């Protein structure tokens, strides 16, 4: 059902849970029927209601029991059994299906503003000949899913056919694939019409799409452009085994042919009532569906769903408004094969097509180099986009982006625009006439024919992009560590692009602890070119600070006092404050203990650095590279010249430290020691302070309000110390375990 059971394995016969084999075919049939009903109920709770009532293991046990029973009694297997969702045969082609009730498209309102809803409401009122003072028309407002329209035909309560929209008159039979979609019931409860065609949308959730693409990348296979194309491709597979591995979902939103089993069949009266009935029959219906009175509530719905759009677990490209009364729908009728009683009110497109005019490199505040596509301006996601990220060199090469290519650009909400992929010649993709919106070349999302196929042949002699060897900002060497995908500037403190982050890191409490030097002040200092390097902090004067915005003389003096106080520090804090990649607090303390002197660290080779506790090849290389840059050494010397100082010592032998090799966890509030002070004492004694309790933990130090870490320690039998026990441990005396 969940992660514990893959669809690809559901058709294999299993002997793990042999059937209890009740005697008598009637008893066997009853057992099989009960198992099917139970499994269908559990699957509905899990996939449709999202409220599972049993663990996956229980579902798996019942499923395998049903498999075993059906294997022993194959004459009792029915098409609607949960075991029959994936069929083994691979088809030669898809069979055309003529829709008994045409799957007509809904007119699209291209005005994405509030006036789009007002225009639709005005047309409806005009067609109904309503006077100005008539009550508002009642509508149903729904999300417009960005997926593949589907018709599900049930006869006698069993799914017998699933067909794509096609041209509205003739689609394709994809029953073998749709059966694998767990949200679509294979059978319906008693009392449904004899013939029931349910219309809806097959789609792929964003999280499922991301996971699918990650699996494709891991296998070295082609990735998908967007969830809609992934869903459409999965539905049209000839091998249902492949479709079963693609995580598809379904929403119902309407009906096609309905033939009541007898007089007195369901008479909905309203579109909303029909949706409620579909939910009762076991079909998923979007939670956002609501009744709206008149244009004002349509506008409010459009705005609310638009604001929530990026938080939804699936893609939508607009909302749909439908007159709620079915009688009024019949009165309004159709025009040029589109219903007058419904409209799709779009949002600004989130994916568009444009051309790459160049590829630049940006340097981020942590030194990461990011290739950025310079684009022909395109309106996407509500703004004009001229640049889009390509993430890193490996992603750029995987997508095979070159200057001059036509590319798909995506922007959702506040997310940085990105190049999704190149539109190759003959890819079967197109843009709608009069826009840059990407659609399938065969048919667009709303059934209209696109006018501009993509793309032309790639321009000859366009070289592949190469990452620069020197930082485009400061000229420092560009490096990429083994196993890393990102290239980085090694300039560190010297690089202007990294300056703000470097200053904030240097000033933080666990580094140089410069009180009052926050983000807003640093922004002014760096952007106003008041400081260019870290030593410039210690050259600040009262006049240069007092002239800044919101900086009175007293506040300026407080900052100067804090700077002066910070000059007296420790070697570990100073090392941490330098912002060397991969060197955190603990590593800085290990370096300080091991070498004792800064000059020894600066002059150490990689092999010497590898002798430090918990320093591996990546960290050692990062430290060596940092101090190999002359400008980084210059910054260090200038800081010393400004009066930054600390006590140096002889190199410590780690084995002589009293707590060398021990792992200690802190939890709760100690009576007199703060957490940072306790951590410093432990690390100075050679202990490693961990954030979680495991079997490798030697002691847990617990204070007031200790939580789950204390419970975990007691469960594992790990000694628990109070503050007195900690102090005894630090003195080398036997601690009194059991405190706290």
From Swiss-Prot:
Cofactor(s), by name: Mg(2+); Mn(2+)
GO biological processes: DNA repair; DNA replication
Class of the enzyme per the UniProt entry, highest EC level: ligase
Keywords from the named record: DNA damage, DNA repair, DNA replication, Ligase, Magnesium, Manganese, Metal-binding, NAD, Zinc
Residues that bind NAD(+): 56-60, 105-106, 142, 165, 201, 322, 346
Listed PROSITE patterns: BRCT, DNA_LIGASE_N1, DNA_LIGASE_N2
Annotated catalysed reactions: NAD(+) + (deoxyribonucleotide)n-3'-hydroxyl + 5'-phospho-(deoxyribonucleotide)m = (deoxyribonucleotide)n+m + AMP + beta-nicotinamide D-nucleotide
EC number assigned by the record: 6.5.1.2
Keyword Hydrolase in annotation: no
Region (Disordered), start-end ranges: 1-20
Binding locations of Zn(2+): 471, 474, 489, 495
Catalytic residues of the enzyme: 144
InterPro entries: BRCT_dom, BRCT_dom_sf, DisA/LigA_HHH, DNA_ligase, DNA_ligase_AS, DNA_ligase_CS, DNAligase_adenylation, DNAligase_N
Record's GO cellular component terms: cytosol
BRCT domain: residues covered: 654-740
SMART domains: BRCT, HhH1, LIGANc
GO MF: DNA binding; DNA ligase (NAD+) activity; metal ion binding
Family designation: Belongs to the NAD-dependent DNA ligase family. LigA subfamily.
Function of the molecule: DNA ligase that catalyzes the formation of phosphodiester linkages between 5'-phosphoryl and 3'-hydroxyl groups in double-stranded DNA using NAD as a coenzyme and as the energy source for the reaction. It is essential for DNA replication and repair of damaged DNA.
Name the UniProt record assigns to this protein: DNA ligase
Protein's organism: Acidovorax ebreus (strain TPSY)
């Amino acid at each position: 059902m969940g992660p514990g059971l893959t669809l690809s394995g559901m058709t294999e016969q299993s002997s793990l849970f042999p059937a209890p084999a009740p005697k008598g075919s009637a008893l066997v049939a009853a057992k099989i029927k009960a198992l099917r009903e139970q499994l269908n109920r559990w699957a509905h709770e899990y996939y449709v209601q999202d409220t599972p009532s049993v663990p996956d293991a229980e579902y798996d046990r019942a499923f395998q029991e049903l498999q075993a029973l059906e294997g022993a009694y194959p004459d009792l297997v029915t098409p609607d059994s949960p075991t029959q969702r994936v069929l083994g045969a691979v088809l030669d082609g898809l069979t055309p299906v003529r829709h008994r009730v045409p799957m007509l498209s809904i007119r699209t309102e291209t005005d994405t503003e509030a006036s789009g809803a007002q225009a639709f409401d005005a047309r409806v009122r005009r067609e109904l000949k309503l006077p100005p003072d008539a009550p508002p028309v009642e509508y149903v407002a729904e999300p417009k899913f960005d997926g593949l329209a589907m018709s599900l035909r049930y006869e006698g309560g069993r799914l017998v056919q699933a067909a794509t929209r096609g041209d509205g008159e003739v689609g394709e039979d994809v029953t073998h694939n749709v059966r694998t979609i767990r949200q679509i019931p294979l059978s319906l409860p008693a009392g449904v019409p004899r013939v029931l065609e349910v219309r809806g949308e097959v789609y792929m959730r964003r999280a499922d799409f991301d996971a699918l693409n990650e699996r494709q990348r891991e296998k070295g296979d082609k990735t998908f452009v967007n969830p809609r194309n992934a869903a459409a491709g999965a539905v049209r597979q000839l091998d249902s085994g492949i479709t079963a591995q693609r995580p598809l979902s379904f929403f119902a939103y309407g009906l096609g042919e309905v033939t009541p089993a007898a007089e007195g069949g369901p008479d909905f009266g309203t579109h909303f009532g029909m949706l409620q009935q579909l939910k009762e029959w076991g079909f998923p219906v979007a939670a956002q569906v609501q009744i709206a009175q008149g244009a004002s509530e349509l506008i409010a719905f459009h705005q609310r769903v638009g604001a929530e759009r990026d938080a939804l677990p699936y893609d939508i490209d607009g909302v749909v408004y439908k007159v709620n009364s079915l009688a009024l729908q019949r009165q309004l009728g159709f025009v040029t094969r589109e219903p007058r009683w419904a409209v799709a009110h779009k949002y600004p497109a989130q994916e568009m097509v444009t051309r790459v005019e160049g590829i630049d490199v940006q340097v981020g505040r942590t030194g990461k180099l990011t290739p950025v596509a310079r684009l022909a301006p395109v309106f996407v996601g509500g703004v004009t986009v001229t640049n889009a990220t390509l993430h890193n060199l490996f992603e750029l090469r995987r997508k095979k982006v070159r200057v001059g290519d036509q590319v798909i650009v995506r922007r959702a909400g506040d997310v940085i625009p990105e190049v999704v992929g190149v539109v190759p010649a003959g890819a079967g993709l197109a843009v709608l006439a009069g826009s840059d919106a990407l659609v399938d070349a065969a048919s667009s999302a709303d059934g209209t024919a696109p006018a501009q196929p993509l793309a032309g042949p790639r321009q000859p002699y366009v070289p592949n992009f190469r990452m620069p060897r020197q930082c485009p900002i400061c000229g420092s060497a560009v490096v990429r560590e083994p196993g890393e995908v990102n290239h980085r500037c090694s300039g560190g403190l010297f690089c202007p692009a990294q300056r703000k982050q470097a200053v904030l890191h240097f000033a933080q409490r666990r580094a140089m602890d410069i009180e009052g030097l926050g983000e807003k002040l640093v922004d002014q200092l760096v952007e106003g070119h008041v400081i260019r390097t870290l030593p410039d902090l210690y050259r600040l004067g009262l006049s240069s600070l007092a002239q800044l915005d919101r900086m009175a003389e007293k506040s300026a003096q407080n900052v100067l006092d804090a700077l002066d106080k910070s000059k007296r520090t420790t070697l570990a804090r100073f090392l941490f404050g330098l912002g060397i990649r991969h060197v955190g607090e603990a590593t800085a303390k290990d370096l300080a203990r091991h070498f004792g002197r800064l000059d020894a660290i600066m002059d150490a080779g990689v092999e010497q650095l590898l002798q430090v506790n918990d320093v591996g090849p990546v960290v050692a290389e990062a430290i060596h590279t940092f101090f190999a840059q002359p400008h980084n050494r210059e910054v260090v010397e200038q800081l010393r010249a400004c009066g930054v100082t600390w006590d140096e010592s002889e190199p410590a032998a780690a084995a002589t430290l009293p707590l060398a090799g021990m792992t200690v966890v802190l939890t709760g509030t100690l009576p007199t020691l703060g957490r940072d002070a306790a951590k410093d004492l432990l690390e100075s004694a050679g202990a490693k302070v961990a954030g979680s309790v495991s079997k490798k933990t030697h002691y847990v130090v617990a204070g007031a309000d200790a939580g789950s870490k204390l419970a975990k320690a007691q469960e594992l039998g790990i000694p628990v110390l109070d503050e007195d026990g900690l102090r005894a441990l630090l003195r080398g005396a036997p601690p009194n375990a059991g405190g706290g």
